[in-house]
UniProtKB/Swiss-Prot annotation:
Protein name per the record: ATP synthase subunit alpha, chloroplastic
InterPro entries linked: ATP_synth_asu-like_sf, ATP_synth_asu_C, ATP_synth_asu_C_sf, ATP_synth_F1_a_nt-bd_dom, ATP_synth_F1_asu, ATPase_a/bsu_AS, ATPase_F1/V1/A1_a/bsu_N, ATPase_F1/V1/A1_a/bsu_N_sf
GO CC aspect terms: chloroplast thylakoid membrane; proton-transporting ATP synthase complex
Localization terms from the record: Plastid, Chloroplast thylakoid membrane
Membrane topology designation: Peripheral membrane protein
Chemical reaction(s) catalysed: ATP + H2O + 4 H(+)(in) = ADP + phosphate + 5 H(+)(out)
Keyword Cell membrane (UniProt): no
Pfam short name (any one): ATP-synt_ab
Matches recorded under HAMAP family: ATP_synth_alpha_bact
Entry keywords, A to Z: ATP synthesis, ATP-binding, CF(1), Chloroplast, Hydrogen ion transport, Ion transport, Membrane, Nucleotide-binding, Plastid, Thylakoid, Translocase, Transport
Organism whose genome encodes this protein: Vitis vinifera (Grape)
Binding site for ATP: G170, D171, R172, Q173, T174, G175, K176, T177
Length: 507
């Protein structure tokens, strides 16, 4: 028989009393009523906040979006395959936030800021809310510095400034992503941090973009946020806000950032899916009533900071895909009304071999020449008008056989202007090269050449100017104006190169 020793028992009781902790921990919990299609209905969670993160028993995280009288609608940030009916859920008391740091540069991450490039964890000492309020009126200043895209058609006629929001819109396969990626490539050496957000894209397309950046050395200053087409709708909905939070981190550190959303219409579709499954009432095209707010609160975060905040900037280029050129659909009209202008890419121009296929007539930048250096204003001021007149004249000339000499000359000039706007992909031009190209076209130096010779002549002229007249580039970059000296140098170079070119062609 086991003897009971009173002293041992009293020691154990004494130890337990000493270890007793009077701290009371209140956890807001609930029970899963129903789960499926990335949505869970929870009973309980009485004091949960809208947008608060909740944690399921098996570790999945969700966001409480619908707070109803008898249950809470939660969207899952994962597949949630192990969640069972009746399992417990606890509120975390936190709103979605991500870690941020310089270490994110050169990495590919998902909407939760977790690396997906297989290169290990990313160290970060601070975090930022995924949804931060946009800067107010006082903390902004008007856009005045250019953000060079390296594309003549944009920088000369639809200029983009630092802190602007410019929509890139067009049908599928018209080169929208190419315009955006070329803009990122052109930021090399410009001290601009770039964030590329891929929402609902094919994984192969994202891999292709990342490979291009790596080959051209652009990943050094770029962060790629990717949620591919097979990701849960919740993560596709969050990805743009994650990208914006990362760009804001640099903007508030007095840096310049460029963020590309490719594309917000996929985000709207993911949000529509979530909203319909949460049984929110559908509106136009079955989108929920707050789909405008979805995009406006995202794009309003792009800004040019005031001098008191360090004059950092965040430039946003959302890309929206249209169906057979229909710009009047719901999402395109929403985004057009939020942004400061749009670059319209046309399938007809693309198929006609005009690439980038920018329709200059209906593209617009509401910031205008404020986002150009003086030299570009001087040279490119009339080119948009000339091209618009040429397009009108060309349409009219199709019905008329006998045209007078002046009209024929105007048509010839317009065709050459259109030719000089063509550019190969991933071949951005410096602002000095653009000024030289436009000046050559608008002043009639190309009129004597055949249309097929224009691009070859311009490429040779750029090389000749760089090697023989480097002072031209120095004048433009130092004074930012197209001085008489620069014009004289350029005229001499064009004449010398024209003689050399014509001799080569005759030989």
């Amino acid at each position: 028989m086991v003897t009971i020793r009173a002293d041992e028992i009293s020691n154990i009781i004494r130890e337990r009393i000493e270890q007793y902790n009077r701290e009371v921990k209140i956890v807001n919990t609930g029970t899963v009523l129903q789960v499926g299609d990335g949505i869970a209905r929870i009973h309980g969670l009485d004091e949960v906040m809208a947008g608060e993160l909740v944690e399921f028993e098996e570790g999945t995280i969700g966001i409480a979006l619908n707070l109803e009288s008898n249950n809470v609608g939660v969207v899952l940030m994962g597949d949630g395959l192990m969640i069972q009916e009746g399992s417990s859920v606890k509120a975390t008391g936190r709103i979605a936030q991500i870690p941020v740091s310089e270490a994110y540069l050169g990495r590919v991450i998902n909407a939760l800021a977790k690396p997906i490039d297989g290169r290990g964890e990313i160290s970060a000492s601070e975090s930022r809310l995924i949804e931060s309020p946009a800067p107010g009126i006082i903390s902004r200043r008007s856009v005045y510095e250019p953000l060079q895209t390296g594309l003549i058609a944009i920088d000369s006629m639809i200029p983009i400034g630092r802190g602007q929001r410019e929509l890139i819109i067009g049908d599928r396969q018209t080169g929208k992503t190419a315009v955006a990626t070329d803009t990122i490539l052109n930021q090399q050496g410009q001290n601009v941090i770039c964030v590329y957000v891929a929402i609902g894209q094919k994984a192969s397309s994202v891999a292709q973009v990342v490979t291009t950046f790596q080959e051209r050395g652009a990943m050094e200053y770029t962060i790629v946020v990717a949620e591919t087409a097979d990701s849960p709708a919740t993560l596709q909905y969050l990805a743009p806000y994650t990208g914006a939070a990362l760009a804001e981190y640099f903007m508030y550190r007095k840096r310049h950032t460029l963020i590309i959303y490719d594309d917000p219409s996929k985000q709207a579709q993911a949000y529509r899916q979530m909203s319909l499954l949460l049984r929110r009432p559908p509106g136009r095209e079955a989108y929920p009533g707050d789909v405008f707010y979805l995009h406006s609160r995202l794009l309003e975060r792009a800004a040019k900071s005031s001098s008191s905040l360090g004059e950092g900037s965040m430039t946003a280029l959302p890309i929206v895909e249209t169906q057979s050129g229909d710009v009047s659909a719901y999402i395109p009209t929403n985004v057009i009304s939020i942004t400061d202008g749009q670059i319209f890419l046309s399938a007809d121009l693309f198929n006609a071999g005009i690439r980038p296929a920018i329709n200059v007539g209906i593209s617009v930048s509401r910031v205008g020449s404020a986002a150009q250096i003086k030299a570009m204003k001087q040279v490119a001021g009339k080119s948009k008008l000339e091209l618009a007149q040429f397009a009108e004249l060309e349409a009219f000339a199709q019905f008329s056989s006998d045209l007078d000499k002046a009209t024929q000359n105007q048509l010839a000039r317009g065709q050459r202007l259109r030719e000089l706007l063509k550019q190969s992909q991933a071949a951005p031009l410096t602002v000095e090269e653009q000024i030289m190209t436009i000046y050559t076209g608008t002043n009639g130096y190309l009129d004597s050449l055949e249309i097929g010779q224009v691009r070859k002549f311009l490429a040779e002229l750029r090389n000749y100017l760089k090697t023989n007249k480097p002072q031209f580039q120095e004048i433009i970059s130092s004074t930012k104006t197209f001085t008489e000296e620069a014009e004289t140098l350029l005229k001499e170079t064009i004449q010398e190169q024209m003689e050399r070119f014509l001799l080569q062609e005759q030989a």
